[in-house]
Amino acid sequence: MRIVLITGISGSGKSVALNALEDAGYYCVDNLPPHVLPELARYLAQDGQRRLAVAIDARSSASLDEMPGLIRELSREHDVRVLFLNASTQALIQRFSETRRRHPLSGSRSHDADVGLLSSLEEAIERERELVAPLAEFGHQIDTSTLRANALRTWVKRFIEQKNNDLMVMFESFGFKRGVPLDADLMFDVRALPNPYYDHQLRPLTGLDQPVIAFLDALPIVHQMIDDIHAFLMKWLPHFRDDNRSYLTVAIGCTGGQHRSVFIAETLAARLARDANVIVRHRDAPVDVDASSRLVSEVDRP
């Protein structure tokens, strides 16, 4: 059975992700107590169910300590994938304000006796980060701070299409002026490269458009940086695998996240697709949903 566990911070899009999996034919359960999960998996497997998605959040805090052991146990018999959704505190506060929903931990008792009840939304968010932090290392993290619901649904569908027998690498382009991604394991700054933005004909385009590709592809310094990053990844990927890492997010940043970082993320993704499962995501580039988050398939490989 394939089991997808969705966890992370409240307001980061867990319900959207769960709904996307339900549309994809998964048997979905929201806020399941972790200790019930093995029994549910056995029951559904006996009943012929082959796909299960479960959302787990801080309301299950009493059982969260059990999750690492449960994930290891389930992985012996099932294809288990963990998706950890995150977002900046500012983005979460804005979402809760817009929806007028109450945070699950608002009004709960703080772990610090001197603080007492968690009176503010920001306190509740930070407390939840502490509670679910141990689960982040088991899952593929994605920062939804700037991600719209339809883009998240598309990304989740791409995520479950990947084979689960090897390290999954996500190349994520972004713009430093919009903040660094929270989900990055490795980050490379490509702002030292010539910027197509200063060519007025290229300014409205992205690193996916042929004129921008031609501009950057003609520069030896661009290929030098790509070669250096690729060499670094090829050297260290075996060590990430040996460390039992299932997911690795490689963030590529330029000023606006529209030209250089997009081109380099695409180029590196195509190269590395020979050696790992690869997803590419463009966080800040003005591209359509399918282009902003997609698998790198055989046809993309040089």
From Swiss-Prot:
Key word ATP-binding present: yes
GO MF annotation list: ATP binding; GTP binding
Residues where ATP binds: G8, I9, S10, G11, S12, G13, K14, S15
Signal peptide: none
Chain sites annotated for binding GTP: D57, A58, R59, S60
Database matches in Gene3D superfamilies: P-loop containing nucleotide triphosphate hydrolases
Alphabetically ordered keywords of this record: ATP-binding, GTP-binding, Nucleotide-binding
InterPro entries: P-loop_NTPase (IPR027417), RapZ-like (IPR005337), RapZ-like_N (IPR053930), RapZ_C (IPR053931)
PANTHER family registered for this protein in UniProt: RNASE ADAPTER PROTEIN RAPZ
Similarity remark: Belongs to the RapZ-like family.
HAMAP family reported in the protein's UniProt record: RapZ_like
Protein task: Displays ATPase and GTPase activities.
Protein name stated in the entry: Nucleotide-binding protein Bcen2424_2795
Originating organism: Burkholderia cenocepacia (strain HI2424)
